[in-house]
A protein has these predicted regions:
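Bacterial N-terminal signal peptides
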Residues: 16-29
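Metallo-beta-lactamase
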Residues: 41, 59, 145-189, 196-197, ...
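Divalent-metal (often Zn2+) His-rich catalytic cores of metallo-beta-lactamase-fold enzymes
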Residues: 224-277, 281
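Conserved beta-strand hairpin/beta-sheet module of binuclear metal-dependent hydrolase folds
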Residues: 57-106, 191-195, 200-203
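C-terminal regulatory/interaction regions
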Residues: 274-320
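Active-site HxH/HxHxD metal-binding segment of metal-dependent hydrolases
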Residues: 98, 105-172
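Active-site neighborhood of phospho(di)ester-bond hydrolases with catalytic His/Asp-centered motifs
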Residues: 91-93, 116-124, 141-145, 182, ...
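N-terminal secretory signal peptides that target proteins for export/translocation
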Residues: 1-12
Length: 320
C-alpha cells in the first residue's frame, strides 16, 4: 500500500520520464541560438565581425594586447603590444603611416607609458611601411637579414643595429620579453616574441591564420621546421601576423593546420616538379584542394609554385 497522493511502480517511472523530457525541451528552448562553433576563416564577414569593429585591441593578458587592423583585400594585419613598467614594446607595425598612427592612438587608450621598443617580426612593407611615425629614439630589435633587406628596399626607417644572436631578452620593467629567431620561414629574418609568464608566442608572418602560405621571399621547406620548433615550445597561445587571434586551444589547432598547409603546398609542387613540368605548367596544373578557398590563394598560389621551384632547383640563394 502506498501513501496517499503518491504514484508507485510503472506509473511513477512513466511520470518521471515525461517530466525529464519536458525539462530537456525547455532547456533546449532556452539555449542561445548562436551557440555554435566559430567559423575557421580569415574573412571577418564570414566570422560575423563587421568591418566597423576595426582597428581593435584584443586583450591577451594583463598589459598584453593583440592589435588587429583590416588591410586590403579584407583581412587582418596583426601587431603585438606589451606594456611594462618602463614603457611599451610593439612587435610589428602596420602598412602605412596612417595605419601605424591609428595603432599608436589605440595604444594610448590603454596606457600613457611611452613606446620604447619595436620588434621587426617581418621586414615586409605591410608591417613596416608606417615605421616613420614611431617615436624618436625608439629601440629597434631586428634580425640582420631583415635589416639588410630594409636597407635594400630603401625603407623609410632602417634600424641602426641588428641582433647578434638568435635570442634576446628585453626588460621592459616588471616583465621580460624574449625575442626569438626560430629559423627562416616567410622571410629570411622572421622574429617571434615570447612572453614566458603568459605563455604567448607572437609569430608575425611565420604564422598566417587561414591565409594561403605567401612565399614571395619564403624558404618553403625550412618554414615547416620553424613552425615545428614553435609547436614544441611551452606556449599556450600562438598569435599570427595575419588572420584572427584565436583562443589558446584553437590557436594551436590553427597553427598545426597552417603548418600542414605549408607542408601540403610544398609536397604538391614537389610532385609536379618531379613529373618534369615547368613552373608555368605546374601553375596551370596544380590543385590546391581545400586551400583554394583560403584568403589570397588565387594571388599567392602561382608565387608559391615559382618559389618552391627555385628551392628545388637550388636557386633560392640568388633570389630575394
Amino acid at each position: 500500500m502506498t501513501p496517499r497522493g503518491r504514484i508507485a511502480g510503472p506509473r511513477r517511472r512513466a511520470v518521471d520520464a515525461v517530466a525529464a523530457l519536458a525539462c530537456s525541451v525547455a532547456l533546449c528552448a532556452l539555449a542561445p541560438r548562436h551557440a555554435h562553433a566559430q567559423v575557421r576563416t580569415a574573412d571577418p564577414i564570414a566570422r560575423g565581425i563587421p568591418l566597423t569593429s576595426f582597428p581593435r585591441l584584443v586583450p591577451l593578458g594583463a598589459g598584453v594586447y593583440g592589435y588587429e587592423e583590416i588591410r586590403a583585400p579584407g583581412f587582418t594585419t596583426v601587431s603585438l603590444v606589451v606594456i611594462g613598467d618602463s614603457g611599451v614594446l610593439i612587435a610589428d607595425g602596420q602598412g602605412s603611416a596612417a595605419a601605424t598612427q591609428r595603432m599608436l592612438d589605440e595604444i594610448r587608450t590603454v596606457t600613457s607609458r611611452p613606446v620604447r621598443w619595436y620588434v621587426v617580426g617581418s621586414d615586409h612593407g605591410d608591417h613596416t611601411g608606417g615605421n616613420g611615425v614611431l617615436p624618436t629614439g625608439i629601440r629597434f630589435i631586428v634580425h640582420p637579414t631583415s635589416r639588410a633587406q630594409l636597407r635594400r628596399d630603401s625603407a623609410a626607417v632602417v634600424p641602426p643595429v641588428a641582433m647578434t644572436s638568435d635570442r634576446e631578452q628585453v626588460d621592459i620593467g616588471g616583465r621580460t620579453v624574449e625575442v626569438r629567431f626560430l629559423g627562416r620561414a616567410h622571410t629570411g629574418g622572421d622574429l617571434s616574441v615570447l612572453l614566458p609568464r603568459e605563455r604567448i608566442l607572437f609569430m608575425s608572418e611565420a604564422y598566417l591564420n587561414r591565409v594561403f602560405p605567401a612565399m614571395r621571399s619564403a624558404y618553403p621547406s625550412e618554414w615547416i621546421a620553424t613552425i615545428d620548433r614553435a609547436l614544441a615550445m611551452e606556449v599556450d597561445r600562438y598569435v599570427p601576423g595575419h588572420g584572427f587571434i584565436e583562443s589558446p586551444a584553437v590557436s594551436r589547432e590553427e597553427l598545426v593546420t597552417f603548418r600542414d598547409a605549408v607542408r601540403d603546398v610544398v609536397a604538391n609542387v614537389q610532385g609536379l616538379h618531379a613529373r618534369g613540368l615547368t613552373a608555368e605548367q605546374a601553375i596551370a596544373a596544380v590543385d590546391w584542394g581545400t586551400y583554394k578557398d583560403w584568403f589570397l590563394a588565387a594571388q599567392q598560389g602561382p608565387i608559391a609554385v615559382r618559389r618552391i621551384y627555385l628551392e628545388l632547383d637550388g636557386k633560392l640563394a640568388a633570389a630575394r
